């Protein structure tokens, strides 16, 4: 079902409704939202709690601007003196401008007046929900990031650096909402799983990278080739955590299907995912020779976390994952700025409470065995619960 078709049922209400002045939260609006019980996207009434201005889309979860263009070179992000502030100052060729959301009210509800308004209000609702869930899971101090809608973002090859449907771009510490694609069933910015994944990536940057625009290990690669493995490990781990949180918030192991059909089957978490020697061998291959694909290894982590949640205590697993972020940062700092796969996995287990630890140990040791993860120190002190399906 396309976005325009989802919007049709309420058009009649707009004819009789009058245009209103600007309003601020709290208020309820009709948006495109995910229904986990029926596993569909539909128009639904949702409460928005953090908008200071609906008309301007300004709020404590992030401020929206639209249009403009930006180009950022990888070499610029790797300068030792680069900061998010300096990169933002130099990246924009034409500045995005303010938005003016058109809406009407009827029967105490806000109705976005057109597709553009529906897109922005629906995204903001998904962003609020993702941030609220992250707070429940133990991360309540996520900084609000700018939101750029339909901004033309390019790299040195004049390609989008967010080619896989991602919404969050770390070097600029900002959300970028792509132009709507009529071929997509649900645009990524309206897909709750995609938004939750983006929020997880932001949380990783804020904690593990201490707010740096890139992985600190990336600055070591020129003089320490071993740092390349760390960079690739981190790319996969943060994607795996993002995919897990996207699955947990939607209760849908195939949330990719609605927006990312080209990668959906490869990232779906409804089937066993196992590490391989090929994944291990890819970790130290320079990107100039073969660009690293972080998704296969990331999917192994996401599956291990999701299956642990299904078979034990999902709250314990997800709060453990969120609580592990400082431990992952510490493991990287204690290893000369380089992150080892086993150390990161052990940090997740160590931060997990109760019987879920044993299930998590079983899943991680099973899924990552082919990547030479045969022992996790924390697992030596807890009972390892064998997973339902084996990779060995």
Regions found by a protein language model. Give the residues of each.
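Extracellular protease catalytic domains of secreted zymogens
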Residues: 110, 116, 123-129, 146-392
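C-terminal motif of bacterial Sec signal peptides marking the signal peptidase cleavage site
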Residues: 15-18
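Terminal and linker regions of secretory-pathway proteins
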Residues: 9-13
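Bacterial N-terminal signal peptides that target proteins for export
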Residues: 1-8
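Secondary-structure transition/hinge residues
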Residues: 1, 131-138, 250, 313
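Acidic/polar low-complexity interaction segments
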Residues: 20-136, 140-147, 153-187, 205, ...
């Amino acid at each position: 079902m396309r976005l325009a078709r989802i919007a049709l049922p309420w058009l009649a209400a707009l004819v009789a409704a009058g245009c209103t002045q600007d309003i601020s939260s709290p208020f309820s609006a009709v948006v495109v939202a995910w229904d986990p019980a029926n596993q569909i996207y539909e128009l639904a009434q949702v409460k928005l709690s953090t908008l200071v201005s609906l008309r301007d889309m300004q709020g404590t979860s992030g401020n929206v601007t639209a249009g403009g263009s930006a180009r950022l070179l990888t070499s610029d992000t790797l300068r030792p003196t680069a900061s998010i502030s300096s990169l933002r100052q130099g990246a924009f060729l034409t500045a995005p401008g303010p938005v003016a959301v058109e809406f009407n009210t009827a029967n105490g509800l806000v109705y976005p007046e057109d597709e553009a308004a529906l897109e922005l209000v629906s995204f903001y609702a998904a962003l609020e929900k993702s941030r609220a869930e992250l707070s429940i899971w133990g991360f309540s101090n996520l900084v609000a990031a700018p939101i750029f809608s339909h901004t033309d973002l390019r790299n040195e090859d004049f390609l989008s650096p967010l080619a896989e449907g991602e919404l969050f771009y770390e070097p600029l510490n900002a959300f970028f909402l792509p132009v709507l694609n009529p071929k997509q069933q649900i645009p990524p910015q309206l897909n709750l799983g995609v938004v939750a994944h983006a929020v997880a990536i932001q949380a990783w940057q804020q904690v593990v990278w201490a707010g740096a625009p890139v992985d600190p290990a990336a600055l070591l690669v020129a003089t320490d080739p071993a740092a390349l493995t760390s960079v690739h490990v981190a790319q996969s781990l943060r994607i795996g955590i993002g995919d897990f949180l996207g699955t947990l918030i939607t209760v849908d192991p195939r949330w990719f299907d609605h927006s990312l059909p080209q990668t959906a089957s490869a990232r779906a978490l409804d089937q066993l995912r196992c590490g391989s020697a090929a994944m291990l061998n890819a970790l130290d291959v320079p990107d100039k020779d073969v660009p690293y694909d972080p998704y296969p290894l990331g999917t192994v982590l996401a599956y291990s976390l999701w299956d642990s949640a299904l078979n034990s205590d999902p709250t314990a697993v997800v709060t453990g994952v969120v609580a592990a972020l400082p431990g992952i940062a510490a493991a990287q700092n204690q290893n000369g700025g380089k992150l080892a796969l086993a150390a990161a996995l052990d940090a997740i287990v160590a931060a997990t409470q109760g019987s879920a630890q044993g299930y998590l140990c079983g899943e991680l040791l099973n899924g990552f065995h082919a990547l030479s993860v045969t022992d996790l120190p924390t697992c030596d002190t807890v009972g390892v619960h064998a997973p339902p399906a084996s990779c060995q």
